[in-house]
Amino acid sequence: MNTSPDRVIIFDTTLRDGEQSPGAALNVDEKLTIARALARLGVDVIEAGFPHASPGDFDAVQKIAASVGSEADSPIICGLARTTQKDIKSAADALRPAAKPRIHTFLATSDIHLQYKLKKTRQEVLEIVPEMVAYAKSFVDDVEFSPEDAGRSDPDFLYQVLERAIAAGATTVNIPDTVGYTTPSEFGALIRGIKENVPNIDQAIISVHGHDDLGLAVANFLEAVKNGARQLECTINGIGERAGNASLEELVMALHVRRSYFNPFLGRPAESTEPLTKINTKEIYRTSRLVSNLTGMIVQPNKAIVGANAFAHESGIHQDGVLKHKLTYEIMDAESIGLTHNQIVLGKLSGRNAFRSRLQELGFELSETELNNAFIQFKEMADRKKEITDRDLEAIVNDEIDTVPDHFRLELVQVSCGNSARPTATVTIRTPDGSELSDAAIGTGPVDALCKAIDRVVKIPNELISFSVREVTEGIDALGEVTIRLRYEGRTYSAHAADTDIIVASARAYVSALNRLHVALQQKEKTPEMLQV
């Protein structure tokens, strides 16, 4: 195995660490959709989940291994496991369909974790790590070990742990900055120290994993690459626990745009034009939008690379410069991440074949049933909007691939409000037993009345903690996308919907979020003793 490749391995953990963002819970079908997108994007490794955490996670990892990772040229499919036999065996079982399975096992090494969380001594850790790495190695050839909270661990102890993990068969050793505490110079020095002080480090690839609590994750990773790290663990849009993880799109485009700077650190001539990663950068924007839509986590407008303002220029001086030559104020082409500027693409006279063709050009793969349903939505929208743009089509398709089971289905919504009238909403909802129930409510505003009317029918307790509206397209007939977040027993459930009528979009988003909560409650009844990770 080449443990010092002249390229950077991209390890995506959107489906594992990214899903730990509050409100980002995904069902199995949604995870499969994202996994397929990650494969198209060209990531080397997909961390599909934590198989022993719950039956749902096990099922997701197994299905991703079978449908996305079963071919010789598929990405490596990885499952997370603590350093216990039960965890590792669950990961091995879930990964069995994968052509290239990897078990990723971890144990904390910082004194604060040993004392307060694990209640273990350093000597116990030195004994557990090689034993469990060897156990994982008995199932798969590819084993990754992570010393959790490595950034706050004693370096000399860390070197000993890594040496034993590699001797036991670890092919990748991952260095996590678990709480986002280190600075770039410190993190670079940590990686350099590992290169210089772990005797058998040439037998493993050095990986890094980091959180963005101080906004330094990407900078830390780039410094790590300069000092010998060759695998970067990251997520789409930087989603993850607390302030999130290192952002895949920012890392990849930094290596892409500043290739001549990073080339020498990977043993290449500075002028080499060979890509530093296997990522198809033209898939970045579409993958970002997909993850945002399925998780319900909106990308802030000023987000680097994929934010709505990333290629926008307000200043007259900047606009003038860009019109004369893009490079005056843009360091990369928007098309390099797959962001096109197509406007009018279809209208109400467009047929099904034209609709299908445009979706294929945009990279969407729909089944016949999904295509038929999406085309019906397109025709309905075309009756209300004169011009249909790619963003409109994207909203239609994202609604169609929103795979939350339709236990409660919105059949009718009607709202009455005004400056001298009490907002009143009437809804009709088809319930899981097939009956249609109608009810009405008044509220402080139209959305409040709407949610109260829906609650009177659905009767699922919850707390609405976030309601937001943003425009999908421009103009007076623009689509409005509503994102709603509910909380129940400490967990958050998100959903979104788009429509030219934001009241209708609000109703659809609220019902969709309630459906997610309903599914979670059903699963909880079936598996009452879920493992908390």
From Swiss-Prot:
Keyword check for Transferase, yes or no: yes
Query: GO cellular component terms?
Result: cytoplasm
Record's protein name: 2-isopropylmalate synthase
Q: Per the record, which residues fall in region Regulatory domain?
A: 409-533
Which species does the entry assign this protein to? Microcystis aeruginosa (strain NIES-843 / IAM M-2473)
Gene symbol here is: leuA
> What functional role does this protein have?
Catalyzes the condensation of the acetyl group of acetyl-CoA with 3-methyl-2-oxobutanoate (2-ketoisovalerate) to form 3-carboxy-3-hydroxy-4-methylpentanoate (2-isopropylmalate).
Q: Recorded GO terms, molecular function?
A: 2-isopropylmalate synthase activity; acetyl-CoA C-acetyltransferase activity; manganese ion binding
Looking at the record, the residues that make up the Pyruvate carboxyltransferase domain are: 8-270
SMART domains, alphabetized: LeuA_dimer
At the highest ranks, the source species' classification is: Bacteria, Bacillati, Cyanobacteriota, Cyanophyceae, Oscillatoriophycideae
Catalyzed chemical reaction(s)? 3-methyl-2-oxobutanoate + acetyl-CoA + H2O = (2S)-2-isopropylmalate + CoA + H(+)
* Listed pathway(s): Amino-acid biosynthesis; L-leucine biosynthesis; L-leucine from 3-methyl-2-oxobutanoate: step 1/4
Q: Just give the chief location class.
A: cytoplasm
Matching InterPro entries: 2-IPM_HCS-like (IPR050073), 2-isopropylmalate_synth_dimer (IPR013709), AIPM/Hcit_synth_CS (IPR002034), Aldolase_TIM (IPR013785), LeuA/HCS_post-cat (IPR054691), LeuA_allosteric_dom_sf (IPR036230), LeuA_bact_synth (IPR005671), PYR_CT (IPR000891)
Residues involved in Mn(2+) binding? D17, H209, H211, N245
The prosthetic group or cofactor this protein requires is: Mn(2+)
Q: Where does this polypeptide localize?
A: Cytoplasm
UniProt keywords, alphabetically: Amino-acid biosynthesis, Branched-chain amino acid biosynthesis, Cytoplasm, Leucine biosynthesis, Manganese, Metal-binding, Transferase
> What general EC class does the enzyme of this chain belong to?
transferase
Entry-linked Gene3D superfamilies = 1.10.238.260, 3.30.160.270, Aldolase class I
